[in-house]
Design a protein with these regions (language model features):
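Beta-strand-rich assembly/attachment modules of structural machines
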Residues: 1-165
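C-terminal extracytoplasmic interaction modules
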Residues: 2, 40-42, 49-51, 57-67, ...
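Short aromatic-centered micro-motifs
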Residues: 22-24, 37, 197, 301, ...
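Short, isolated positions in well-ordered beta-strands
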Residues: 30-32, 44-46, 204, 307-310, ...
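Local beta-strand/beta-hairpin segments that build beta-sheet-rich folds
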Residues: 32, 114-117, 308, 496-503
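Short, conserved beta-turn/loop elements at beta-strand boundaries and strand-helix junctions
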Residues: 122-132, 306, 652-661
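Short solvent-exposed strand/turn elements
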Residues: 128-153, 380, 659-680
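Long, low-complexity intrinsically disordered regions enriched in Ser/Thr/Asp/Glu with frequent Gly/Pro
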Residues: 244-247, 279-415
């Protein structure tokens, strides 16, 4: 049997067909096509009247470069599909669309197949006397997935496994591991190696998600899986130094309820929610929810912008306060030893699968009358890491955007069976490669090419998150011919496409790489661009208007070179401003940028694509476009516009009926945009610690009449010390203004 990529290049081919396979919720399979054929032991009914494959677009709102939606209209004069809707229901069925070449005369397939679409079926769009219309959304339509997924609430947020299949999955997560819906609870009293208790020798089949129900099922004090936050310490009579007896102030932070448990990737400063605080007369005790776990570690804690040291056993720390990491967020929670009842038994919540702190500060920092401001610098989630062969390596802390994207996908419901892990490992290796740059003092250092430090405290759709992380690291998603999701790096042609692929018609390399297809106007004896009815080539060259072409970009980030202080970078194209007389400013939708160097490289690359890459081409071709995806590099020879093997990057593909015709839109490409030095600026142009700061200690609890407010700052050696408030507020401000860099003959300026 021939390959579809060999057949598509022939002057005369067999009939190209799309095959629709739909599996309903009860396991029943339906097979349709535009023609009645037999393939793979199944008969495809000629039910499809028309179908619409929505165009595939790079950097789409769905966050992934795949067909977002399919609409199919089928013959329904006999009410066949209507009966299935009444008896079974179409909603939630899975739809797979594959492509092949088929010989209708011999009733045999003449090629292998390629998966074009995989998705979930909606409820029927409409049903008429003769037609039945269904639509399906792609599995990668991330607009329907919201992160963070867990809300702060008094009842436990973990799903309870109510039947034997769910309890089997709850033991260790089954095939989904830690991403199983039933893994956080894990009740599996009737399973080998399971957790929990039974009633009368029979496992519980339901749960009210309360503390009482959790205790009855043996999951509260045993494995400590309860995830609700309901404990509020009682007010007791206390006596502070030099004061009389009074009731201790207790602040139950009810404002956090219905907020979201933070998700922290990489390393970042953030404001974690305070669960409660209680003052004992001299000290204020707090529990602080760090986020979903397991996380790596806590580096630093500030309360009202004063640094609090890590608690040390055997030392009197009442003058400074202290913090302890009670739990890093393991599946089995940990009780706070500071919260016990009169008998010494734990009285608080175990925070199953959540990380949290116990923070104690003296009255001079906070007297318990109001909630303080708590800031934490922490190393975030430990995520699974895989080898180049796709094998699991370990679960560890990482700031690599490839593994962070995989974790987001897994939390969004994707299984490992639908992911090409080897492609993620290859992208991860590229991101981890060391490149040379300068620190804020101008010293030469080596850093990973791309990293991601991101804290999610407010819910947003996963499509925005994926697109933001991709924009900050030049990553893109595509599908393989077998239907697996792949992660690739947008790069120069030599690095992105070093070898020839099966669907390419290229016969020679271009700048060290292979174009995935070469489209020509016939000037070199080859013509594979369709012509219109009047004989004109179906080629349209366009450009964006001035107002749609930004020449000034800005991005915010926490700079790892400057102790993760909040910062921003503004980059301009001076030549374009001189040319147009206008400053067109926009904020780059990039998330997780970790340092000044990566911010400069990404802004430089984005500016180049917007201004120098402001040439787009749209052309129509035949089934020869099969195999091409957004992000691929092709060449176009169209002498009328002066294009001769000019590389373009595909940004949009719109397939027609049965893939017989395809419209392709591409953006002009230059390899120089992707060099590691593009956009880099001298390190000593960035923010530096302010001079004159020094290491100090907080005021003691008693005996000091100096009433100045002190705030955490950064010393010249990068250590946190103390400085006066007015001085510290300037540590994160950029001091460069109007510095100009010349790259590729164009003047570029940067300010911060």
């Amino acid at each position: 049997m021939s390959s579809i990529y060999d057949l598509k290049e022939q002057a005369v081919t067999d009939t190209p067909l799309l095959l629709f396979n739909c599996v309903l919720q009860n396991g029943q399979s339906e097979y349709w096509s535009t023609h009645q054929i037999s393939y793979g032991g199944n008969t495809y009914a000629p039910r499809v009247i028309k179908h619409n494959l929505i165009e595939v677009q790079a950097a789409s709102d769905q966050g992934v470069d795949v067909i977002p939606r399919v609409s199919v209209s089928m013959a329904n004069a006999d009410s066949y599909f209507s009966e299935l809707e009444r008896s079974v229901g179409w909603k939630g069925a899975t739809l797979t669309v594959t492509f092949l070449f088929y010989d209708l005369l011999t009733s045999a397939a003449t090629s292998d197949t390629a998966v074009i679409f995989q998705g979930i079926v909606n409820s029927p769009d409409q049903s008429t006397e003769s037609l039945f219309q269904l639509s399906a959304i792609n599995l990668m339509n991330m607009q329907r997935v919201l992160l963070p997924p867990v809300r702060i609430q008094r009842r436990c947020p973990w799903l309870f496994p109510g039947n034997i299949q769910q309890r089997q999955d709850a033991v260790s997560g089954g095939n989904s591991g830690q991403y199983s819906l039933y893994y956080p609870c894990g009740y599996s009293a009737d399973q080998a190696g399971g957790a929990g208790t039974m009633v009368g020798g029979v496992p519980y089949t339901s749960c009210g998600y309360t503390r009482t129900d959790c205790e009855a099922r043996g999951m509260f004090t045993g494995p400590k899986r309860f995830g609700g936050l309901e404990f509020v310490p009682s007010s007791i009579q206390v006596r502070g130094y030099g004061t009389g007896w009074q009731y201790a102030p207790v602040d139950d932070n009810v404002a956090i309820y219905n907020d979201f448990v933070p998700l922290l990737y990489g390393t970042a400063w953030y404001y974690p929610p305070i669960v409660f605080s209680r003052n004992d007369g001299n000290l204020t005790h707090m529990e602080v929810l760090l986020g979903m776990g397991p996380i790596q570690d806590v580096r630093m804690v500030l309360v009202n912008q004063i640094q609090i040291p890590l608690g040390q056993s055997g030392k009197n720390m009442t003058s400074t306060g202290w913090y302890n990491v009670v739990s890093l967020g393991s599946r089995n929670g940990v009780f706070n030893p500071d919260c016990v009842d009169a008998s010494g038994n734990p009285a608080g919540d175990p925070y199953g699968s959540m990380a949290y702190l116990s923070v104690v500060v003296p009255n001079q920092i906070n007297n318990g009358q109001s909630l303080p401001t708590v800031q934490v610098l922490a190393d975030g989630l430990q995520v699974p890491i895989y080898g180049s062969d796709g094998s699991y390596q370990n679960t560890a802390f990482t700031a690599n955007p490839a593994w962070i994207l995989l974790d987001i996908l897994r939390r969004s419901g994707w299984s490992m069976a639908n992911v090409d892990i080897a492609s993620f490992a290859a992208a991860s290796a590229f991101c981890d490669q060391q490149i040379q740059t300068q620190d804020l003092s101008g010293n030469s250092i080596m850093i990973p090419r791309f990293q991601c430090n991101l804290c999610l405290q407010h819910r947003r759709n996963a499509g925005d998150l994926i697109r933001g992380i991709r924009n900050g690291s030049r990553l893109l998603f595509t599908y393989s011919t077998s239907g697996l999701l792949q992660l690739q790096v947008e790069n120069s042609i030599a690095l992105q496409q070093p070898s020839q692929v099966a669907w390419s018609n290229s016969t020679e390399t271009l700048n060290g790489g292979w174009p995935y297809y070469e489209f020509e106007d016939g000037s070199t004896s080859t013509a594979n661009i369709l012509r219109k009815a009047n004989g004109e080539p179906s080629v349209v060259v366009t450009s964006r208007s001035i107002v749609d072409t930004p020449n000034q970009l800005t991005v915010e980030f926490q700079d790892a070179f400057n102790s993760y202080q909040q910062d921003s970078l503004l980059m301009v194209d001076v030549d374009d401003i001189d040319l147009t007389g206008q400053v067109i400013t926009t904020s780059l939708m990039a998330l997780g940028i970790p340092n000044y160097d990566q911010a400069a490289r990404i802004l430089g690359y984005t500016l180049d694509r917007a201004i120098q890459g402001n040439t787009y081409i749209t052309l129509e071709t035949s089934v020869k476009a099969l195999g091409l995806r957004p992000g691929d590099l092709i060449t176009v020879t169209y002498l009328k516009e002066g294009f001769e093997r000019q590389p373009f990057r595909i940004v949009k593909i719109a397939p027609g009926s049965n893939y017989r015709t395809t419209k392709i839109t591409g953006q002009i490409h230059q390899d120089s945009w992707y060099e590691d030095t593009n956009g880099q600026m001298p390190g000593n142009t960035g923010a530096r610690p302010q001079p004159g700061s020094a290491v100090g200690v907080p005021h003691p609890l008693l005996g000091n009449t100096n009433r100045h407010e002190w705030r955490a700052a950064i010393s010249d050696h990068g250590e946190f010390g103390q400085c006066q408030r007015r001085r510290c507020n300037r540590t994160a401000q950029r001091g460069i203004l109007g510095s100009v860099q010349h790259t590729g003959g164009r003047a570029r300026g940067a300010t911060g």
